[in-house]
């Protein structure tokens, strides 16, 4: 059967353009070596099957031959090794991308996105498992996702990694050294990972897609050096350098401080893609004029977080104003609004910036952030408050800021259980997995005159969405109230 599965895989490679006809024998021999097998019998014609099914059979065969431990982490390491037998080398990929880019940047990214799926670097069959829905809110239509495509940490792999000497190569999952890396129990295989080198702000950066695709064409742009995240004038220059090269993509950066930043603060990187987030659709509700920057349209966006939108035909003018706003905000304290630039020498104010091209104008959204903590809010005053942690307690990073909730995988099972308990009128507090949701359910359930098997799913989706709106409102340094707007304008007046 091994010969049949190998033939199916190489036929898939030819069908998707990964493998030229003249390399089929070469790929077959590489695959045989992965299985420590010496001979191959051509099975003749084979049926066309989904990649997931072919890989499953190959992995089962490898387990049978005791070539790998049967767990998700080790199966992922092994199937990436198999797919690399079909994947063109980096120079070929870069050359194809450049050739297409010279004709049309969109054509280049379309090709590379498809390529990243065909190599199984983006595992399409896992992405499909993600639960996604939209909800209406006072701020427009928001996206809610429960992320199921990122594999849970594998206990066997973690235990094995603990026993082995600590490895510090690659330094992190964003480093250039990941390209071609076989991976290990605690680090994903990246043999099929291909990086497109790009130049931004006169320095070498890389362009890739996120293997977990939280939204369409979710890309990552990262420094070739392992250097920490830092929001500064150069950040705005880099964002616009990228948008000028790929005007059909938006690009943003996580903030550079804990709590309000993303999960990786140690490696300078941005995230972007081809998706219109709710925040981009949100209108400017109040325009302001900044002295000396009359040529830059400036305004407060109707959004739960505190957003200043700048737009102009000249990106350099936006960069100058953004730098002025950033420097002012870094040092800004307003006790009445509970904004403190620093306490005990620890800085609190930073910005989450997002750049895009809209028609003939360049646009930059500056989201004001502050990571101060108090006894009442030990995880952050401008962070989801404790009563919302049953749904979301993780950092509110760039993707959430723009209106897309990335909720933890645990919610899938918890919502299924809640549904059952609500429909069967069972006491939620008796189940330790879902007792944390009890007071929330008690609060919203009375507002629905009828709850049945037909509408329970939508009710839970709506209510989870309402919690996400509150999460975003908690993260806003200036609330969407009359006082909040006055406080916001007081800051803008200092500019």
Predicted regions and their residues:
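Active-site microenvironments that recognize anionic phosphate/pyrophosphate groups
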Residues: 1-221, 225-228, 302-304, 318-322, ...
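Helical scaffold of the NTase/Pol beta-like nucleotidyltransferase catalytic core
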Residues: 191-194, 226-251
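Coil-to-beta-strand transition motifs
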Residues: 216, 248-250, 263-265, 278, ...
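Catalytic or ion-translocation cores adjacent to nucleophile or general acid/base/metal-coordination motifs
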Residues: 234, 243-263, 272-324, 330-333
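Beta-rich nucleic-acid/ligand-interaction surfaces
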Residues: 258-266, 344-350
């Amino acid at each position: 059967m091994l010969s049949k599965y190998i033939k199916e895989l190489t036929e898939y490679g030819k069908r998707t353009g990964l493998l030229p006809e003249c390399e089929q024998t070469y790929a077959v021999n590489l695959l045989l070596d992965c299985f420590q097998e010496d001979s191959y019998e051509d099975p003749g014609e084979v049926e066309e099957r989904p990649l997931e099914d072919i890989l499953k059979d190959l992995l089962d065969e490898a387990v049978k031959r005791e070539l790998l431990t049967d767990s998700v982490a080790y199966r992922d390491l092994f199937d990436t090794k198999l797919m690399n037998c079909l994947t063109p080398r980096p120079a070929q990929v870069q050359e194809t991308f450049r050739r297409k880019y010279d004709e049309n940047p969109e054509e280049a990214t379309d090709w590379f996105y498809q390529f990243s799926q065909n190599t199984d670097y983006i595992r399409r069959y896992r992405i499909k498992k993600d639960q996604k829905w939209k909800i209406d809110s006072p701020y427009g239509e928001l996206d809610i996702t429960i992320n199921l495509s990122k594999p849970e940490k594998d206990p066997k792999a973690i235990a094995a990694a603990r026993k082995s000497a600590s490895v510090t190569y690659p330094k992190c999952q964003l480093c250039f050294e990941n390209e071609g890396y076989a991976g290990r129990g605690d680090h994903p295989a990246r043999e099929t990972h291909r990086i497109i080198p790009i130049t931004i702000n006169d320095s070498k950066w890389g362009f890739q897609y996120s293997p977990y695709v939280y939204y369409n064409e979710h890309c990552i742009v990262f420094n070739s050096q392992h250097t920490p995240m830092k929001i500064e004038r150069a950040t705005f220059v880099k964002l616009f350098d990228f948008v000028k090269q790929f005007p059909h993509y938006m690009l943003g950066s996580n903030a550079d401080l804990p709590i309000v930043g993303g999960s990786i603060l140690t490696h300078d990187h941005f995230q972007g893609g081809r998706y219109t987030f709710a925040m981009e659709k949100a209108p400017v509700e109040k325009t302001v004029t900044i002295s000396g920057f009359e040529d830059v349209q400036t305004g407060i966006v109707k959004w739960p977080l505190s957003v200043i939108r700048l737009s102009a035909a000249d990106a350099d003018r936006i960069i100058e104003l953004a730098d002025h706003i950033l420097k002012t905000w870094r040092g800004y304290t307003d006790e009445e609004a509970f904004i403190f630039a620093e306490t005990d020498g620890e800085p609190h104010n930073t910005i989450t910036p997002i750049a895009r091209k809209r028609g003939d104008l360049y646009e930059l959204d500056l989201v004001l952030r502050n990571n101060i903590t108090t006894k009442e809010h030990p995880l952050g005053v401008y962070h989801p408050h404790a009563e919302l942690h049953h749904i979301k307690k993780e950092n509110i990073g760039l993707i959430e800021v723009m209106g897309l909730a990335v909720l933890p995988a645990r919610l899938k099972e918890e919502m299924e259980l809640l549904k059952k308990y609500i429909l069967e009128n069972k006491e939620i507090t008796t189940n330790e997995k879902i007792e944390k949701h009890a007071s929330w359910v008690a609060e919203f359930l009375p507002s629905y005159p009828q709850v049945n098997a037909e509408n329970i799913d939508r009710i839970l989706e709506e209510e989870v969405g309402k919690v996400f709106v509150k999460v975003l409102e908690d993260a806003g340094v200036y609330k969407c109230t009359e006082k909040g707007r006055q406080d916001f304008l007081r800051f803008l007046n200092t500019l």
